[in-house]
């Protein structure tokens, strides 16, 4: 097994990486998720001088690779974010375009379960007019479902839990969610096992 340490932007990303479903998927790819998953508590903390103490904490688990997962939020493009947080100690930096919630929108099966709407399909989860969190509220209202609530972490736990069963593979398979695909493919490459 290839040991992978994670530094994530916030609580929702931490929920995803620590979820049983994600760990099971990672194991099937020859990856072991190191503990703890480090929460930077905001994209502004993902700067080289802030990352060094986080790296010291994660290196106790002796990872083979260190991965950073963050959101684009309002940055101009992915390269701007990478340039801001690049450090020689991390192997891969992945950016969820706009926000992690776009990946939830891209998992059609989990969204259909949440909305109880078998016809649901989000055509452009990474190109929502506003932030993906706002889009989740809109689609819930349009389908007469309860919204995601006011707490992103609670919603992330619900999406990644046993009832809705969010899966990275399904989000990555969405034709308009290239950031989830890049994340999945990058992790698969680290594990060295052929993607199935």
Annotated model-derived regions:
Residues 1-3, 12-40, 45-196:
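C-terminal accessory helical subdomains adjacent to catalytic cores in phosphodiester-
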Residues 6-8:
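RNase H-like, metal-dependent nuclease domains and their acidic two-metal-ion catalytic environment used
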């Amino acid at each position: 097994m290839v040991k992978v340490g994670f530094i994530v932007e916030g609580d929702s990303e931490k929920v995803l990486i620590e979820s049983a479903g994600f760990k099971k998927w990672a194991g099937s790819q020859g990856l072991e998720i190191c503990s703890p998953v480090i929460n930077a508590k905001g994209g502004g903390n993902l700067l080289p001088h802030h990352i060094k103490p986080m790296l010291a904490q994660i290196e106790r688990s002796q990872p083979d690779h260190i991965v950073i997962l963050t959101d684009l939020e309002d940055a101009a493009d992915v390269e701007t974010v990478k340039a801001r947080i690049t450090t020689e100690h991390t192997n891969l930096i992945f950016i969820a375009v706009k926000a992690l919630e776009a990946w939830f929108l891209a998992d059609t099966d989990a969204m259909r379960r949440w909305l109880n709407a078998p016809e649901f399909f989000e055509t452009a989860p990474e190109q929502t007019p506003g932030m993906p969190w706002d889009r989740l509220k809109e689609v819930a209202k349009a389908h007469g479902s309860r919204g995601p609530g006011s707490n992103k972490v609670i919603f992330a736990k619900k999406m990644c839990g046993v009832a809705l069963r969010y899966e990275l593979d399904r989000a990555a398979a969405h034709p308009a969610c290239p950031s989830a695909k890049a994340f999945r493919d990058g992790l698969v490459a680290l594990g060295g096992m052929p993607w199935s």
